[in-house]
């Protein structure tokens, strides 16, 4: 499913708590092995939070040069959680060919919103049982972004992309078809867990949003149109 809580509501900690519960139920080795794929800037944040909140879970960061990473990947029995970045997963994907993970987590899942990118293709190639996507923005601009995440989670659930376009995207985006939109919501709703700050932090004042429209000028317009 998609854990889509607002930023700051603890998606990382919720995921780690789930993995700890799996270990406490007696799962080890192949039954527990988890691959976490995250932007490079967050790799060591995951490692830090594992050590701080769930030290019972062992982890390793796939890092180093190509040969060092290959050796770490081939030594598959030594840690509960493996952490790598989207970029390194693309480079190392062949090394994962014969490895199966019980769980696969993709953080900042908007990184795979374009289903044709190498990042999106790589996470799909990993052999894994339970899959989870973490993102506060499962869809930013186009319905195809939502399809791409679901195609990672449950391939075929929203059909192939061409089928999705014909059954949902064109009717919703071009015709504003409310019936089709409601049907899509009913399909994806059970698999999206989302809390907003306003729902859980009642002591905070409401956020005030103001939209200001401005015109792009000069170099800004040239860069935007490029």
Predicted regions and their residues:
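Long, charge-dense, solvent-exposed interaction surfaces that engage phosphate-rich ligands
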Residues: 181-183
């Amino acid at each position: 499913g998609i854990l889509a809580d607002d930023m700051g509501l603890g998606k990382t900690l919720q995921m780690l708590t789930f993995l700890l519960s799996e270990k406490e139920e007696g799962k080890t080795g192949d039954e527990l092995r988890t691959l976490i794929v995250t932007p490079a800037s967050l790799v060591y944040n995951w490692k830090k939070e594992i050590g701080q909140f769930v030290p019972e879970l062992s982890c390793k960061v796939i890092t180093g040069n190509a040969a060092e990473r290959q050796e770490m990947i081939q030594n598959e029995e030594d840690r509960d959680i493996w952490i790598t970045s989207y970029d390194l997963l693309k480079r190392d994907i062949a090394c994962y060919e014969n490895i199966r993970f019980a769980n696969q987590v993709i953080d900042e899942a908007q990184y795979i919103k374009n289903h044709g990118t190498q990042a999106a293709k790589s996470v799909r190639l990993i052999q894994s049982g339970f899959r989870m996507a973490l993102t506060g923005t499962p869809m930013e601009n186009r319905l195809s972004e939502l399809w791409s995440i679901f195609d990672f989670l449950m391939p075929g659930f929203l059909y192939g992309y061409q089928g999705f376009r014909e059954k949902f995207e064109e009717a919703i985006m071009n015709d504003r078809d409310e019936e089709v939109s409601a049907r899509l919501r009913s399909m994806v709703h059970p698999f999206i867990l989302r809390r907003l700050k306003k729902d859980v932090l009642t002591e905070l004042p409401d956020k005030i949003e103001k939209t200001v429209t401005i015109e792009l000028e000069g170099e800004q317009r040239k860069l935007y149109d490029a």
